Amino acid sequence: MRFTLTRWCLTLFIFLNRPLPVLPDSADGAHTPTLEPEPFLYILGKQRMLEAQHRCYDRMQKLPPYQGEGLYCNRTWDGWSCWDDTPAGVLAEQYCPDYFPDFDAAEKVTKYCGEDGDWYRHPESNISWSNYTMCNAFTPDKLQNAYILYYLAIVGHSLSILTLLISLGIFMFLRYFNLLAPFNALLYPTRSISCQRVTLHKNMFLTYVLNSIIIIVHLVVIVPNGELVKRDPPICKVLHFFHQYMMSCNYFWMLCEGVYLHTLIVVSVFAEGQRLWWYHVLGWGFPLIPTTAHAITRAVLFNDNCWLSVDTNLLYIIHGPVMAALVVNFFFLLNILRVLVKKLKESQEAESHMYLKAVRATLILVPLLGVQFVVLPWRPSTPLLGKIYDYVVHSLIHFQGFFVAIIYCFCNHEVQGALKRQWNQYQAQRWAGRRSTRAANAAAATAAAAAALAETVEIPVYICHQEPREEPAGEEPVVEVEGVEVIAMEVLEQETSA
């Protein structure tokens, strides 16, 4: 999977700004392709065609003369593709060039060598003609697919932002009330480790939020705006810099999660609280190095419009460390599963139940560590499988923040239990407040009635200061709000400590 998200954004930009094919359906040696004067399209397309033309001329000079018998068509460069010597009456074919995203490199271009040993000439122009119609025959389908992926990205990242912000709010709320118990008795035996785990979660959730916001801005502001890309303002490249930085931070905080879990489970289950500042340096600080190096080299060596092109190996400055982080997390996952299966075997559980737990642990850890991008690295070449691959991979990319928020916050039993306890405490305080208010109103009414009776019988004022009457035996004593809160907090602390 080579720069999947970046390449898709480039393809979508081409389609949204030019839904019709970029190149005409034919080519010949005397024809020079015409491109609209958009620097981004012109530079990329012409540069790749010139490189292919130089390779073709070198090849024609190095190949030996035609060794066959009979008439043949001479080797030639038709403007887009290189053709070898071809016997008369043969339809030569090769794969379509990949100069432009709307050309399908999986389709084929054909060129017919006539019986007279001359390349076929188009009847209208009377010049040699190559059939490139299949190269862009499926452009409307690709355009429709690009629009679907475009809206899938908008919906996925918007939903991820919403759920992640709610999750961060829940973590902040539970942290404020000090209610969040350890997530798992095996993985997190102490309260401090639980707090460290939540801190890692919050940082990773924050990278998801910031990355999704930047991607939405990029898709809404940059991708559909061909005029903006043509002007190539500095803010365009600044946005690209932060996009690459937040993407790197996202994957390196996944690596932080993997390092933390691996240290906790494999190295020492009963380890003391780890130093979190190392994780902050790795998650927030280290991605600045490859991102800054990429920005400098890109500005000097490959300064294309808005840095949208993927036709440069400079992207490996960023994607190389990201790929390394994913591979490391993949091995962490395998080692963690090995330890978990070993512990399940030692507990003498049923074999089916043991493997069910192992599978469940795998499914939970996969989105956290991002190893799905290691398992699905290459796109199939067939159209149907390629389309299925696109939808699966882009769903995982755009909805990953949503999946992580659901699994590690909303579906977490400890988070649910803490929220229920806080809700029950709130209900108890509210109910006690209502009872106290009703009791105060009743006491005020009784005092008013006693005062009216005293005025009627002319009782001295000091008699109103007599001792309060005893409560009837069948009536419950009024409980103050403060008492209820103290008792509830004591019970809650006992449950938490247990």
UniProtKB/Swiss-Prot annotation:
Location(s), subcellular: Cell membrane
Listed name of the protein: Calcitonin receptor
Regions that span the bilayer: 148-170, 199-219, 237-259, 277-297, 314-337, 358-376, 385-411
UniProt topology in membrane: Multi-pass membrane protein
InterPro entries: GPCR_2 (IPR050332), GPCR_2-like_7TM (IPR017981), GPCR_2_calcitonin_rcpt (IPR001688), GPCR_2_calcitonin_rcpt_fam (IPR003287), GPCR_2_extracell_dom_sf (IPR036445), GPCR_2_extracellular_dom (IPR001879), GPCR_2_secretin-like (IPR000832), GPCR_2_secretin-like_CS (IPR017983)
Glycan-carrying positions: N74, N126, N131
Biological process annotations from GO: adenylate cyclase-activating G protein-coupled receptor signaling pathway; amylin receptor 1 signaling pathway; amylin receptor 2 signaling pathway; amylin receptor 3 signaling pathway; cell surface receptor signaling pathway; negative regulation of ossification; ossification; osteoclast differentiation
MF terms in GO: amylin receptor activity; amyloid-beta binding; calcitonin binding; calcitonin gene-related peptide receptor activity; calcitonin receptor activity
Function per UniProt: G protein-coupled receptor activated by ligand peptides amylin (IAPP), calcitonin (CT/CALCA) and calcitonin gene-related peptide type 1 (CGRP1/CALCA). CALCR interacts with receptor-activity-modifying proteins RAMP1, 2 and 3 to form receptor complexes AMYR1, 2 and 3, respectively. IAPP, CT and CGRP1 activate CALCR and AMYRs with distinct modes of receptor activation resulting in specific phenotypes. Ligand binding causes a conformation change that triggers signaling via guanine nucleotide-binding proteins (G proteins) and modulates the activity of downstream effectors.
